[in-house]
Amino acid sequence: MAAMALRRLLLRYFPPGIILEYVEGVESKTKSIDLLDLRPDTDVTALVEEIQKREPLITASCLEHVVCLVQRLQEKLGEKQNHKFSLFKVLRTHILPLTNVAFNKSGSRFITGSYDRTCKLWDTASGEELHSLEGHRNVVYAIAFNNPYGDKIATGSFDKTCKLWSTETGKCYHTFRGHSAEIVCLSFNPQSTLLATGSMDTTAKLWDLEKGEEVATLNGHSAEIIALSFNTTGDRIITGSFDHTVGVWDVGTGRLLHTLIGHRGEISSAQFNWDCSLIVTGSMDKTCMLWSAVTGTHIATLAGHSREVLDVCFDYAGQRIATASADARVYNAGTKQCIAKLEGHEDEISKVCFNPKGNCILTASSDKTARLWDAATGHCLQILEGHTDEIFSCAFNYKGDTIITGSKDNSCRIWH
Amino acid sequence: MGLLSILRKLKSTPDQEVRILLLGLDNAGKTTLLKQLASEDISHITPTQGFNIKSVQSQGFKLNVWDIGGQRKIRPYWRNYFENTDILIYVIDSADRKRFEETGQELAELLDEEKLSGVPVLIFANKQDLLTAAPASEIAEGLNLHTIRDRVWQIQSCSALSGEGVQDGMNWVCKNVSTKKK
């Protein structure tokens, strides 16, 4: 075995972790030590001892540095956040309703998709429009940055194609053709070598970004695919379908590994947790389900909602789950107990997300408001009012101090 | 409604569901008609910048009605909504004689669209409550409706404001859906 030498240690705030850059032989590599259970009051000395036992790269000489990093992570977690958000800018250059919105990793840029067939790239600090990505012949529905890099943007359209763009120049690198119906979900793999697209044609496809070619078609669902998501390592992808099931696929071979069967209504959302052990699914059958990502077996049903579950997500550490329906709820992914009910929206909630730190939840609703909630208590912290029609989408930046909302009223709003 | 509900309404519908596209120039009364169909308040209606969707039960059908904004700058985007259309309803402001030519032109272009080929079309000669409204027969003649031969069509005079004639039009819709869907 080639000798391994540690080059440097990097912090990852959300979810808490330390990234190791090291050299093995002549190859430069990275790996991460996840500290998902870290709390502000965790015993640092004991934790670092534990890390040293588990990780041969962490030698006595760098222990002091590791202690320092863990303390920085704890400080970050312990920071009191009573940030009040207020409207910073209303962006009105889309001439038809918005669909989805997304930030890049640093939060310096964000993108908006629209019924006006464009995707626009914005500068978050100034609210200036940097590029209008034009070329689709129908609604731009699904959009994404290739985070953490952020140098590419993918757009999926009702015109059945997907396009890959340069963030820097706004030029289109590739148009991916092959789906026979609307593309409604997409995602880059974490390595940013592949793009996955899900379509109303009941298939998902994997595309090679470099070559601009189709790599695999994930064939197996009997109805529309409306959600897809890679796991953290990028070797698995899940597809949620209106056929009531979720497919778990091997990315390398395109083979179907498991079909998660149990929901009695269309799937609305599906996601892996950070350590790739669990999958959460939301359904029109008014429930969420937890599954083992490894075996595909059903672990628990999170019941309690009286209406369709329209969105579901894990927090960054993968320890809690937020669900959106007529009201929103927070569940502990370990105990499966409901921790909090987020009540107050006057119409259905269509999107829900945690801030990266996990102490705060953002919801977007048909009642024209977005709301912020304390993730632990369920108290409403703030109501973001101003949109004049339903809010379709919302997002936090990585720092958690900026929010964007996209609405049917044709506008996007930036909140600081 | 939410984006997900829109996707659900986008897919090819089961037998008992009908996708209806409501088009016409700005200020023709499409949104008023939509709200009248859904028995909603019609006192505060503003120009539609995007679209509105409502589902109404009628004669055993679930009618999913898509009301699309008609302003000139967003008419090129009507095409976004053509997929899976079962019935086209075209609304005309019968009192806006200055724009009969414009509305006739837009209708003719719609009837030429490949994705709408063969789709039954109901033309509502709306705003019959106004004294200056042209009768349906005059509009039919002005728009050369009798030359439509590639689909079934009907013109129905109505007032979306009072509701008069609206139900007659919808009866025609249900009748023509049933022949197509069953």
From Swiss-Prot, chain B:
Pfam families: Arf
Membrane topology reported for the UniProt record: Peripheral membrane protein
Disulfide bonds, paired cysteine numbers: none
GO terms for biological process, alphabetical: cilium assembly; Golgi to plasma membrane transport; intraciliary transport; kidney development; mitotic cytokinesis; photoreceptor cell development; protein localization to ciliary membrane; protein transport
PROSITE patterns per the UniProt record, alphabetical: ARF (PS51417)
GO molecular function: GDP binding; GTP binding; GTPase activity; magnesium ion binding; microtubule binding
GO CC, any one term: midbody
Record keyword Cell division present: yes
SMART domains: ARF, SAR
Principal localisation: Golgi
Domain of life: Eukaryota
Lipidation (N-myristoyl glycine): G2
NCBIfam families: small_GTP
Record's function text: Small GTP-binding protein which cycles between an inactive GDP-bound and an active GTP-bound form, and the rate of cycling is regulated by guanine nucleotide exchange factors (GEF) and GTPase-activating proteins (GAP). Required for normal cytokinesis and cilia signaling. Required for targeting proteins to the ciliary membrane by releasing myristoylated protein from unc119 cargo adapters into the cilium.
Protein name per UniProt: ADP-ribosylation factor-like protein 3
Organism per entry: Taeniopygia guttata
